[in-house]
């Protein structure tokens, strides 16, 4: 005669995680940080924002970016400008720029327009264009890793637990 065996599991939800910091840290580490499948869900939109922005400014984009909180040696963003364009051209290109609607688009537009208002970028000779482009590259790099850093933060983890109503086993797996 077959037997039925049942096992009870203790399940933890958001309220449990908020009450027990040690439990929260353990599950956060196992489920969020250590999972090789956990990457920033917005990374594709971020890359699309960079591509659309570069395309709008008639620049070529080359990049290698990790999906981690911090860059490694192989990470870079490289923009290659059209040196025939000047300050007025770039401002005109950005005038009605919306990008793909993601926040990086507006951040890059605002940052670049502020750069173009600076004295050193009023006239874009080759060296000034190189400096101008370098500042945009650095901004893209900073936006990428700031977004990843936030995504992997404990605060972001707790927000995901709340909006998805996740419940966990003590070993850090979803219940």
Language-model features: locations:
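Alpha-helical propensity feature that highlights long, continuous alpha-helices across diverse contexts
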Residues: 2-175
